């Protein structure tokens, strides 16, 4: 789910993973494609094929998490509210256009998502 988010803040104790392989299935909802796009093929293959969990620090170093914040969930929520407020104070049209421009770089992702659905 993380690769679908625009901005990701995490606590230092957060863990992430693609555990579906442990259940005999592949990540759904485009998970294989989104993770590969976000962190690269080799690293995505390792995580998807082993089902290994990874830390917030690893996720941050790979660019999957925007920032590791504070010491706990409460601090992450406070920082998320600050980020949201900063964005809300910008021009709505400019924010929407910027999001669309960034998202346009992922248009080919849909092809991979179709492959996930077919599996």
Predicted regions and their residues:
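C-terminal long alpha-helix characteristic of the crotonase
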Residues: 9-14, 65-115
